[in-house]
């Protein structure tokens, strides 16, 4: 390889080591101050230090920023970020692209860097999933049935029966109980959902969701603004939003909701005084909203087919399971019908 070509390759390696290190630092800062998983923060720090060890004086000496034609190039999207989670995801993409460039060009002059970049790239894929809740969001997208609890003396037992037959998602909804009592229930539900491999969400209370180690929180229209909740919870955990009209659904997506509650479809004592939105809103969300949506409100065996016919792939229920004579069998029936498609 000619000397001029080698200098170009060294400049490419220098630029992309800078790019990767800067991207890692952006992610690391959010994990540090935004409450991300401790293991992800440690992984970021280790990766940044490893990148630094390969950023030698030889590579730095090849730098020629004044004559780099790429420094003045900009794209309109580069000046726009919708949320901290968006910042984190953009920078993960930047890291992955830089590592791929390092992997390819380092083969020409520094094979050990090429091998390391390949290993790092696959580690970053896993790190992104862990740090941004990709694993949680994948499981959320696969969920078809969502149990929202109501106060009951045998609440834990009912939920366990439902989990035993495959219920993938549970929300603790306790509107009246004192915070300490709710936390006690939440800790017990967190334990049983972990044992059964199910997602666990807490209604309304970001503080209690964090205190019990839940997978996320569900917010109503009058609860803490979603952006504030995200700032407290970090990018990994799930945030759901109740919606009752197309404008609310669009706003929830714009605010970064991971999933939507779509309802109430039918009249329900859980939402006393609220006019049902009907099946048309279910149809609208299925056709127009690019987020998982759970139809909710008065759904039971008698009307499930109509809800599915309106386009619902996912439903949330309260009384249909909480008040069932056999919660396990009822849950199994819903799962079988929903998974049939």
Swiss-Prot record:
SUPFAM superfamilies: Thiamin phosphate synthase. Pathway: Cofactor biosynthesis; thiamine diphosphate biosynthesis; thiamine phosphate from 4-amino-2-methyl-5-diphosphomethylpyrimidine and 4-methyl-5-(2-phosphoethyl)-thiazole: step 1/1. Mg(2+) binds at residues 204, 223. GO terms for molecular function: magnesium ion binding; thiamine-phosphate diphosphorylase activity. Residues 1-123 are annotated as: Unknown. Keywords: Magnesium, Metal-binding, Thiamine biosynthesis, Transferase. It comes from the Bacteria. 2-[(2R,5Z)-2-carboxy-4-methylthiazol-5(2H)-ylidene]ethyl phosphate binds at residues 268-270, 298. Binds 1 Mg(2+) ion per subunit. One of its GO terms (biological process) is thiamine biosynthetic process. Residues 61-80 are annotated as: Disordered. Disulfide bonds: none annotated. Residues 124-341 are annotated as: Thiamine-phosphate synthase. It catalyses: 2-[(2R,5Z)-2-carboxy-4-methylthiazol-5(2H)-ylidene]ethyl phosphate + 4-amino-2-methyl-5-(diphosphooxymethyl)pyrimidine + 2 H(+) = thiamine phosphate + CO2 + diphosphate; 2-(2-carboxy-4-methylthiazol-5-yl)ethyl phosphate + 4-amino-2-methyl-5-(diphosphooxymethyl)pyrimidine + 2 H(+) = thiamine phosphate + CO2 + diphosphate; 4-methyl-5-(2-phosphooxyethyl)-thiazole + 4-amino-2-methyl-5-(diphosphooxymethyl)pyrimidine + H(+) = thiamine phosphate + diphosphate. It is an enzyme of class 2 (transferase). It holds the Pfam family TMP-TENI. Its cofactor is Mg(2+). Belongs to the thiamine-phosphate synthase family. Condenses 4-methyl-5-(beta-hydroxyethyl)thiazole monophosphate (THZ-P) and 2-methyl-4-amino-5-hydroxymethyl pyrimidine pyrophosphate (HMP-PP) to form thiamine monophosphate (TMP). PANTHER family: THIAMINE-PHOSPHATE PYROPHOSPHORYLASE, THIAMINE-PHOSPHATE SYNTHASE. This is Thiamine-phosphate synthase. The gene is thiE.
């Amino acid at each position: 390889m000619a000397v001029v070509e080698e200098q170009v390759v060294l400049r490419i390696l220098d630029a992309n080591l800078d790019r990767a290190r800067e991207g890692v630092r952006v992610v690391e800062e959010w994990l540090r101050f935004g409450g991300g998983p401790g293991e992800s923060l440690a992984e970021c720090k280790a990766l940044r230090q490893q990148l630094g060890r390969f950023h030698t004086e030889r590579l730095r000496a090849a730098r020629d920023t004044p004559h780099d034609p790429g420094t003045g190039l900009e794209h309109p999207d580069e000046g726009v970020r919708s949320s901290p989670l968006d910042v984190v995801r953009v920078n993960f993409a930047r890291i992955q692209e830089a590592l791929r460039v390092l992997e390819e060009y380092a083969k020409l002059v520094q094979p050990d860097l090429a091998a390391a970049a390949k290993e790092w790239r696959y580690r970053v894929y896993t790190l992104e999933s862990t740090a941004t809740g990709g694993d949680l969001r994948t499981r959320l997208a696969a969920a078809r049935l969502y149990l929202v609890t109501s106060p009951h003396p045998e609440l834990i037992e009912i939920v366990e029966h439902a989990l035993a037959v495959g219920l993938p998602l549970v929300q603790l909804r306790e509107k009246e109980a004192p915070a300490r009592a709710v936390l006690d229930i939440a800790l017990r539900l967190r334990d049983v959902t972990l044992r059964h491999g199910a997602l666990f969400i807490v209604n309304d209370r970001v503080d209690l969701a964090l205190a019990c180690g839940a997978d996320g929180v569900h917010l109503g229209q009058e609860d803490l603004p979603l952006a504030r909740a995200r700032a407290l919870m970090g990018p990994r955990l799930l945030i759901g939003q109740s919606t009752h009209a197309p404008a609310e659904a669009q706003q929830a997506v714009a605010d970064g909701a991971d999933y939507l509650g779509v309802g109430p479809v039918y009249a329900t004592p859980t939402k006393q005084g609220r006019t049902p939105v009907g099946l048309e809103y279910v149809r609208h969300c299925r056709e127009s909203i690019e987020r998982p949506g759970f139809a909710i409100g008065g759904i039971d065996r008698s009307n499930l087919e109509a809800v599915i016919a309106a386009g619902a792939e996912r439903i949330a229920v309260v009384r249909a399971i909480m008040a069932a004579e056999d919660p396990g069998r009822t849950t199994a029936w819903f799962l079988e019908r929903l998974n049939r498609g």
